[in-house]
Amino acid sequence: MSDLTDIQEEITRHEQQLVVARQKLKDAERAVEVYPDDVNKNTLQARQQTVSALEDKLADYKRRMADAVSRKKMDTKPTDPTGIEPDDHLKERSSLRYGNVLDVNAIDIEEPSGQTADWYTIGVYVIGFTIPIILKALYMLSTRGRQTVKENKGTRIRFKDDTSFEDINGIRRPKHLYVSMPTAQSTMKAEELTPGRFRTIVCGLFPTQIQVRNIMSPVMGVIGFSFFVKDWPEKIREFMEKECPFIKPEVKPGTPAQEVEFLKRNRVYFMTRQDVLDKNHVADIDKLIDYAASGDPTSPDDIESPNAPWVFACAPDRCPPTCIYVAGMAELGAFFSILQDMRNTIMASKTVGTAEEKLKKKSSFYQSYLRRTQSMGIQLDQRIILLYMLEWGKEMVDHFHLGDDMDPELRGLAQSLIDQKVKEISNQEPLKI
């Protein structure tokens, strides 16, 4: 509907309807105050929905009106015979044609897209919901994340569950969990939840619940995360007791041999790392940790906690703030991100194509994780990541899922049968299984 007259008529009609609807809403509110029965409550809810729908439609028509006026101005603008726009500063026409007009009115430069999120506000918002809706939303944004993002890109979605509701004047209403699904051009507010921020905060707050329900992101499944977390307490305990190549203790004469051996262990290096982290706290993250400690969240306070690796089960894009001051946790996430890059490099290497096509299939999970985590105020200890790689790198690579689980003999036999049948029914080249 591009005609200005028609749009103006629709705006006038909807404004009149909105006046009537708001009056009916006031009457319904008074009726509920006098007789708060189910009939009046349902009527009130219906009136509220009607007003909301009319307001949305009116706003849409006003946007259309603004667009139509803008287009009309552009159409009536006199064109310069030289082909130069009237406000262009060039004296002669450029060799480049004029492209799109990029509208930057919606961008707030006080809150650039690369900013650090307001983790305290985000954490308080998420903790205010029931566990079921949080975990179901996490499942939709991790296990089924690619599909959910694809279907809802560029919108602000609402998760709804019967366990999440609030009572307003005796009326039970759904309490929606809002998550923004940005595009590359979107500018996010500091307190706005995106899929990446949601996975980060929920993984950090509720790793035990995630472990019990075995919620896992596909990108973690294919690097053998299930194998890694099996017998984690024993695995990390053995790791801590091994000799650390980066420690050379200054031993005084007469020191017992047992104490000398202890001072060379990984555990001592982690204790030193913990001392460094304890001096680098950020006030907002400390507030979040204190707030979380007073409620249901189960954030690990030690790398040896049984639920510690489950913080990364849903592939958060940085170390969750609730465990960023636990020695070795941020580095464990970096170790997982390197494994993801290693698997993608293997997959890219075995595919057929040019070197450029193969490079496109590589990833940079590690660089992204490193940048995002360090923006939260800590520097990762590369030596700890190296210790993890030396200890578990080989066995993790052996447990990668590389999409080639078929036995070579079985594959060869199946391919020969395919080739034979294709030759019988056509003269086309058979595809590879």
UniProtKB/Swiss-Prot annotation:
Motif (YxxL): 178-181
Site description Important for the endonuclease activity, residues in chain: D88, D103
Region (Homomultimerization): 1-79, 100-125, 377-425
Main location: virion
Domain of life: Viruses
Stored InterPro entries: Hanta_nucleocap
Record-given protein name: Nucleoprotein
Region (Interaction with host RPS19) location: 150-175
Gene symbol of the encoding locus: N
Amino acid composition bias (Basic and acidic residues), ranges on this chain: 69-78
Known function: Encapsidates the genome protecting it from nucleases. The encapsidated genomic RNA is termed the nucleocapsid (NC) and serves as template for transcription and replication. The nucleocapsid has a left-handed helical structure. As a trimer, specifically binds and acts as a chaperone to unwind the panhandle structure formed by the viral RNA (vRNA) termini. Involved in the transcription and replication initiation of vRNA by mediating primer annealing. Plays a role in cap snatching by sequestering capped RNAs in P bodies for use by the viral RdRp during transcription initiation.
Protein species of origin: Puumala virus (strain P360)
Residue ranges, annotated region (Viral panhandle binding): 1-175
